[in-house]
């Protein structure tokens, strides 16, 4: 009886997977490329985006500088009675 329930579940999952509709947009707008040229184009786009993001992050660092570094010193060292 348990094996029958298992088979029914597996068949239902298989039917659901085969009949489900996946709607997603393609990574690349043009779909007429072959497999290898499509991968090359995707890789090139990813590298361009990575360079752009690195440029942005480096620009933010130069704008902020070291303003986030704390230059505060404890007046008498760490408090031994703290905690």
Curated annotation (Swiss-Prot):
Coiled-coil segments on the chain, per record: 38-58
Signal sequence segment: 1-24
A Gene Ontology molecular function term of the record: receptor serine/threonine kinase binding
Modified residues (Hydroxyproline): 75, 78
Record bears the keyword Secreted: yes
A GO cellular component annotation in the UniProt record: apoplast
InterPro entries: CLE1-4
Region of interest (Disordered), residue spans: 53-83
Positions annotated as glycosylated: 78
Keyword list, A-Z: Coiled coil, Developmental protein, Differentiation, Glycoprotein, Hydroxylation, Secreted, Signal
An example Gene Ontology biological process: cell-cell signaling involved in cell fate commitment
Similarity comment: family membership: Belongs to the CLV3/ESR signal peptide family.
Protein name as it appears in the record: CLAVATA3/ESR (CLE)-related protein 3
Organism: Arabidopsis thaliana (Mouse-ear cress)
């Amino acid at each position: 009886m348990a094996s029958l329930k298992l088979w029914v579940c597996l068949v239902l999952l298989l039917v659901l997977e085969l009949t489900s509709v996946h709607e997603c947009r393609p990574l690349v707008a043009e779909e007429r490329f072959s497999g290898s040229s499509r991968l090359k184009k995707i890789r090139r786009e990813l590298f361009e985006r990575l360079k752009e993001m690195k440029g942005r992050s480096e620009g933010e660092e130069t704008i902020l500088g070291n303003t986030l570094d704390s230059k505060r010193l404890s007046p008498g060292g760490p408090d031994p009675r703290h905690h």
